[in-house]
């Protein structure tokens, strides 16, 4: 196996373990976990494919402990959508010659909490149509706000540490897509 592939799998394993542990051990805090922020940071450092793989591993393994159901697909979908939006933003910033800054990216991470809720709630649209979707989403809006605020705070905490630790590795591995 190519050494970069081994490094990629190892990094996904490490970050997934952090995400999984946080989902399990912080479950008493409603929607306040570092998972979305770590996924955003992973896309920034290692690219879209890495972020998608991290999202799938995090969701499937943590849901083996927390409960597996139809929502698992929509959780994966939500984090993949966040990966796509993050990659689009990174490509745009690169095109205009800008580097992502801490506070604006924390604000971006905040809004991704609402994106997550909108996408996860799509299950209700399929089950009960637009009326159920709207009611379900509105009922969960407080939890999406917890998610958003948690993302903002966790991004401010995690980004400086993870970027410092993994930036050199991402350049060495050349996982990031150009």
Residue spans for each PLM region:
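Hydrophobic transmembrane alpha-helices
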Residues: 1-41, 45, 49, 53
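Transmembrane alpha-helix boundary and packing residues in multipass membrane permease domains
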Residues: 40, 59, 83-87, 121, ...
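Short helix-perturbing small/polar motifs within transmembrane alpha-helices
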Residues: 8-16, 54, 74-125
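Helix-boundary and loop/linker segments of multi-pass membrane transporters
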Residues: 1-5, 29-30, 94-99, 129-133
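Interfacial aromatic-anchored transmembrane helix boundaries in multi-pass membrane proteins
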Residues: 20-32, 56-90, 128
